[in-house]
Amino acid sequence: MQPEKIEHIYQSNLELFSQANVSYQQWQHEPILDFDADERIGKELGWTAAPTKSLFMKVKGGGHCLLLTHRDSRLNSKLVKQVLGKRVSVCTHEEMIEEIGCAPGAVCPFGLPADITLLVDPVVYSYQDLMFTPGKPDMTFAFAASDLDKLLQKLPNTVIPLPGE
């Protein structure tokens, strides 16, 4: 982990929600770095928002992208290749830390370098509320899924919605 990058991502998230005028809930808790801890802490804190997953991937031929999806969804690499025109592979923990500074299990979909393409799985729109880690593994944000597009429009990243399956 790179604490300065994580702090930057966290502050970028606070600014993003403010600029987009999107309400959110915030919790501080023990660090969540895997699905078991996520589920346990979620039950303890009474979370009802849908947990998201941010898969950080490298694109064949250069560059990176991130897939924002539901925690239980699986990567459809054929669909991603169809959309990007190139194959992708999930980055190793070391590559991810080097590129964006996030801890494995605490990758944030917002506040990333502008050259990272953000792919959005349409499944996330089927939930009332979404939650994610804003860079810091001991923090969780939740917001209305209906506000996702307001947030995405404020990002400097290229945002590509995946077609529904």
Language-model region placement:
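Extended, low-hydrophobicity, polar/charged segments
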Residues: 1-165
